[in-house]
Amino acid sequence: GKAEAIRRLRKGSANKVPFQPLPTTSPRKDSPLRILGVGEIRHPALIGYLRERGIDPAVAGALCREVHYAIGERRFFAIGFRNDAGGWELRNSQFKGSSTPKSITTFDRHGDTTLLFEGFFDLLSYLTLQHEPTPTADTAVLNSVMNLPRALPFLARHATIHAFLDNDEAGRLTLERL
């Protein structure tokens, strides 16, 4: 643990700490991710993860589910956010991934203004700050900036787009493409 690492650093033997790679949890071509079950978010680890991220669990519970999945023979669980094609965006403290098919998620309230988010945790953060359990305005979640072309028909129907994208190169390029 931490105390052992400090002790070894003080003794000058830190280079003798054995390297133990973390097991990979990302899907491989020979072991695709399979959804095993979906239900209400109940696991204490997932509720704790939401709280660590500053997300109101009631907000997450309105839009997300607890998804149990397998990669090969190993079983896992995560917070799942469903996309318009029936796939899931999956997050927990150890994993960020998705099931197929990969797509955007939209909430159509038939307005002339839309909100655009890069990822679903961005949407959950926004809703937590607004004290709203679900979007009241038209909303699109890209679930990846690579999905922008899929969102363009939905976005084009709106006179105003409020974009909540990451302040990085991918977010800036996405904004330029709008």
Task: Identify the role of each PLM range.
Residues 2-9, 54-66:
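Short, surface-exposed acidic
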Residues 39-40, 44, 48, 61-73:
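Eukaryote-skewed repeat-based solenoidal scaffolds used as protein-protein interaction platforms
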Residues 69-157:
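Phosphate-handling DNA/RNA-contact segment within nucleic-acid enzymes
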Residues 144-148, 165-175:
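Acidic, metal-coordinating catalytic cores used for nucleic-acid/nucleotide bond scission
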Residues 153-154, 172-178:
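Short, aromatic/basic amphipathic alpha-helical patches
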Residues 116, 158-170:
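Acidic beta-strand-to-loop metal/phosphate-binding motif
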Residues 1-49, 169, 173:
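Non-catalytic accessory segments of DNA primases and related replication-initiation nucleases
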